[in-house]
UniProtKB/Swiss-Prot annotation:
EC number: 6.5.1.2
Catalytic activity from the UniProt record: NAD(+) + (deoxyribonucleotide)n-3'-hydroxyl + 5'-phospho-(deoxyribonucleotide)m = (deoxyribonucleotide)n+m + AMP + beta-nicotinamide D-nucleotide
Superkingdom of this protein's organism: Bacteria
Ranges for domain BRCT: 584-654
Keywords (A to Z) from UniProt: DNA damage, DNA repair, DNA replication, Ligase, Magnesium, Manganese, Metal-binding, NAD, Zinc
BP term (GO), one: DNA repair
Protein name: DNA ligase
Organism: Mycoplasma pneumoniae (strain ATCC 29342 / M129 / Subtype 1)
Cofactor(s) named in the record: Mg(2+); Mn(2+)
Pfam families on file: BRCT, DNA_ligase_aden, DNA_ligase_OB, DNA_ligase_ZBD, HHH_2, Nlig-Ia
Gene: ligA
CDD domains registered for this protein in UniProt: LIGANc (cd00114)
Record GO terms (molecular function): DNA binding; DNA ligase (NAD+) activity; metal ion binding
Length: 658
């Protein structure tokens, strides 16, 4: 008992030091004193491993390497916020809420950190899961990396399940230090944070000193918190890092003044922000205000006015996209813009270049449109010389040299050669992307290599790639047996993605992810959409004449119909997936946790999809006391079976997914 008490006391002391150092930025002891106490704890734990505490600072150390991150559905969807680009919109937002609720409300203003959103789950006081935002419905569990962030508590004094959300980021100073030592620097701090958080080796995360701020608790009423201010106070009490730049206001005029002042001083912060979030403080009115189809009505993001910087335009890169559209991109002298090193900016199309009279070697003003894509705003004409020559118009496709066309009422030029190699490559790359069929393991470089070697010349060829294993392994792609099998598994899994993702991946002009999902509400499958008349298409709420014509023409093109037939022949499902709210809740498998081991007649990914749709299950790679069932196939891992037996976890040997 004496050793337990000694270890517990050291853990609490180190946690206190960590909180003051990483959260309050107020060190209590020197690094030497901290290290000595840490080494004392390590020695005690090595001598008594059975006494290691789950919240011990030694449990944060990186070095865990995982093959992949497991995906899990969010308990509550992680929605985006609607944006306001001026203070008048914010004032209107506040007035509308006050009118609807009938009272003068308090509003909380929080910095919108330019980082990576994270959702932490604590069970019985212990941090058990850390999900990225993902698509808002499903995220990746990056717990092994999050545990290396020393400002995040591993335990909290609350013994029910609770979800806590925040933002993980890299501060400006750390970003500059890390980039100094990289052969290929990160373009911005957000990319560095995202890449670090998704690195499969947690040792990388431990070295990069990620930071975090927390600001939201879904279902906060279960904590007894009746306002956002109370949530932030509770988070501070639990030693979570909360931004000092949070403020609250009873008067709209004072809030607006704060927004304007913050915009002028934000560069003084040591972290990148891309706006401020204005939230209604009182939770009592949240249900009354509700949500739009995309956003909560009780919060709004105020986006800062774009900043402008000056640089030299050294050249123009002309490329062709999957639809044949020609893109003009300015090649710039590198310049820092809003925390990002920018060396390229969009010029849109040649009409834009002519309208702005942009020339080679001009000094130009660039800015970030919506804080995302750099654009060329204008030319600094007083700095122009006679040596600045006009940019020539592209008349032929830069990839296949086919003549370009410009359609009536459009400003863009197009390559109409359907056999253009670059167009086909971009089309395949888009088809496998996360927003479309989500086939993992295929970069544009890999696709290009497969294309050059006649292994993948169209999206249909992806589904025959398993027949060319030897040829793929022979290429210099750094793809071995294990990665090849994972790639094939991901390709096979994509067959079940359904109509919306397939429609997105086909790259039909004017049909993106949102419209594709909308079409599945009106047509039960691709065949029904293919049979739709122009009149039927024009009756749809999200379809105008241009989109209707594009859809109708695509589905009446012989080449496209042959493509659909070939995809159907290899087993790609073309029905609209219905969201399953009719789980088998009476089953013993409903919402249980599974480990899958061994081989089966169908892929593990397919099994997981079937079990999720039927029982709303969860999955993990390791057998622990938190696992409910082990699903064992042929040649199941003996160690996992032994662990299951030791923990009295049922082992299933039958196809429960059918």
């Amino acid at each position: 008992m004496a050793k337990v008490a000694q270890i517990r006391a050291i853990v609490e002391q180190l946690k206190r030091y960590d909180y003051h150092y990483y959260v309050l930025d107020d060190p209590l002891v020197s690094d030497f004193e901290y290290d000595q106490l840490y080494k004392q704890l390590q020695a005690l734990e090595q001598a008594h491993p059975e006494l290691i505490q789950p919240d011990s600072p030694t449990q944060r150390v990186g070095g865990i390497v995982v093959e992949a991150f497991n995906k899990f559905p969010h308990q509550n969807p992680m929605l985006s916020l609607d944006n306001a680009f001026d203070t008048a919109t914010i004032a209107s937002f506040i007035a509308n809420i006050n009118n609807l609720t009938g009272v003068q409300n308090r509003f909380v203003v929080e910095p919108k950190i330019d980082g990576v959103s994270i959702s932490l789950t604590y069970e019985n006081g212990l941090l058990t899961r850390a999900l990225t935002r993902g698509d808002g419905l499903v995220g990746e569990d990056v717990l092994s990396n999050v545990k290396t962030i020393k400002s995040i508590p591993l335990t909290i004094p609350f013994h029910k399940q609770v979800e806590i959300r925040g933002e993980i980021f890299v501060d400006k100073k750390t970003f500059a230090q890390i980039n100094e030592n990289l052969a290929k620097p990160f373009a911005n701090a957000r990319n560095l944070a995202a890449g670090t958080l998704r690195n499969l080796n947690s040792e990388v995360s431990a070295k990069r000193k990620l930071k975090a701020f927390f600001y939201f608790v879904p279902n906060a009423l279960t904590l007894g918190c009746r306002s956002q201010s109370a949530v932030l106070a509770q988070l501070k009490q639990w030693n979570f890092p909360v931004s000092k730049a949070v403020a609250s206001f009873d008067r709209p005029e004072a809030l607006i003044e704060y927004l304007e002042q913050f915009d002028q001083t934000r560069d003084q912060l040591n972290f990148q922000v891309d706006g401020l979030v204005v939230k209604l403080d009182n939770f009592h009115f949240y249900d009354q205000l509700g949500f739009t189809s995309k956003f909560p009505r009780w919060a709004l993001a105020y986006k800062f006015k774009p900043k402008f910087v000056q640089t030299k335009l050294r050249g123009v890169l002309v490329t062709v996209g999957r639809t044949g559209k020609i893109n003009y991109t300015a090649q710039l002298d590198p310049v820092n813009l809003e925390g990002t090193v920018v060396s390229a900016a969009t010029l849109h199309n040649f009409d834009y270049i002519k309208e702005k009279d942009i020339r080679l070697n001009d000094t130009v003003i660039i800015y970030k449109a919506g804080e995302i894509i750099p654009k060329v705003l204008e030319v600094c004409l007083p700095l122009r010389t006679a040596a600045n020559q006009p940019i020539p118009e592209q008349t032929h496709c830069p990839a296949c040299q086919a003549p370009l066309v410009q359609y009536k009422d459009e400003v863009d030029q197009y390559c109409t050669n359907e056999r253009c190699d670059q167009r086909n490559l971009e089309a395949i790359n888009y088809f496998v992307s996360k927003t479309a069929m989500d086939i993992q393991g295929l970069s544009i470089q890999t696709i290009s290599k497969l294309y050059e070697n006649n292994l993948v010349r169209s999206v249909v060829d992806l589904y025959h790639l398993k027949e060319h294993k030897a040829a793929v392994l022979a290429l210099e792609l750094k793809i071995g047996e294990v990665l090849f099998n994972k790639l094939i598994s991901s390709i096979e899994q994509s067959k079940t993605k359904g109509m919306a993702r397939l429609l997105t991946g086909l790259g039909i002009k004017h049909v993106g992810q949102v419209l594709a999902k909308s079409l599945t509400k009106h047509f039960e499958n691709i065949d029904a959409l293919q049979s739709a008349s122009m009149e039927t298409l024009l009756e749809l709420p999200d379809v105008g004449p241009t989109v209707a014509e594009s859809l109708f023409n695509w589905f009446h093109n012989d080449n496209n119909l042959q493509l659909l037939a070939a995809l159907k022949a290899v087993g790609v499902q073309m029905d609209a997936l219905k969201s399953n709210t009719n789980f088998d809740t009476a089953s013993i498998y409903f919402q249980k946790s599974f480990v899958i081991t061994g081989s089966f007649p169908i892929s593990r990914d397919t099994i997981k999809n079937l079990l999720v749709n039927k029982y709303d299950c969860r999955f993990t790679n390791n057998v622990t006391s938190k696992v409910d069932f082990v699903l064992a196939g042929i040649k199941a891992t003996p160690r996992k079976l032994e662990q299951a037996k030791a923990l009295n976890i049922p082992i299933i040997n039958e196809p429960i997914w059918t």
